[in-house]
């Protein structure tokens, strides 16, 4: 193979969810709505938590950070996706592709570890309620937040640097709607052995570590709940955990389906499954966490009433200034 064929590609083409031109505008409308709902829903969760003193505790602290991470997570992927729906070329530069891959891995891992931190918090609240305030103090919360952020930055940097060392000399068409690791690796004409080994060892460990924490936490919760004598007490404990468990199943179920398989078997079905943990979980989180949570509902209602009041005052002042 000549040296001219080994030059680094300057851009990739993102094939997207569909190559049919008639699908592009409906998909654009659908994902624009999903993106706007994601931004609005998660932003309302953050504002409700920070404006209500009754929601100033570790559980809602982690939920507000998760909502912020979800906003960032979808923003890394969806805006470029929307542009490509209306574009004929559907290109992404090499540097932009690596940047998208990096931040996708960063916020994906932060989401994963935050779900583990929330499970630990629930475990302490249910299994050790009398020492909850002592155990889940400010220092503990900061550590549970600092570790996933620090780890996610270095974990993502490792994988992106390993991709950057590869040579792409055949096709530049990525069969995906964003620069995910596996579809990009499939384009490489140099050996991806090191990348695959790291993905199946360090990458797998980074996914399994928080998942194991969640499993252990919920096993302890289950044992503690079964010891509660009253049916009402058991129901209250289970309902407290149900929203978090729903998100965990959605997130880890789709991740396991996509990534716990050989690189060669990556197909269109994986592209669809990826939507679950990149887009759907982020848009569903505000609804899942608020629908069955009375405190969260109260906080959101209080925030909405406050916004309405401010808008009413602004409208009244505007009318006075403008006159009849």
Curated annotation (Swiss-Prot):
PROSITE patterns according to UniProt: G_PROTEIN_RECEP_F1_1, G_PROTEIN_RECEP_F1_2
GO biological process: signal transduction
Single annotated GO MF: olfactory receptor activity
Main location: membrane
Topology Cytoplasmic: residue spans: 50-57, 121-139, 220-236, 292-324
Keywords: Cell membrane, Disulfide bond, G-protein coupled receptor, Glycoprotein, Membrane, Olfaction, Receptor, Sensory transduction, Transducer, Transmembrane, Transmembrane helix
Topology of this chain in the membrane: Multi-pass membrane protein
Pfam families: 7tm_4
Domain of life where this protein originates: Eukaryota
Extracellular topological segments: 1-25, 80-100, 159-196, 260-271
Cysteine pairings via disulfide bonds: 97-189
An example Gene Ontology CC term for this record: plasma membrane
Cellular compartment(s): Cell membrane
Transmembrane segments: 26-49, 58-79, 101-120, 140-158, 197-219, 237-259, 272-291
Gene3D superfamilies per record: Rhodopsin 7-helix transmembrane proteins
InterPro entries in the record: GPCR_Rhodpsn, GPCR_Rhodpsn_7TM, Olfact_rcpt
Glycosylation sites per record: 5
Membership in a protein family: Belongs to the G-protein coupled receptor 1 family.
Function text: Odorant receptor.
Protein name, entry field: Olfactory receptor 1L3
Organism expressing this protein natively: Homo sapiens (Human)
Organism phylogeny: Eukaryota, Metazoa, Chordata, Craniata, Vertebrata
Gene responsible for this protein: OR1L3
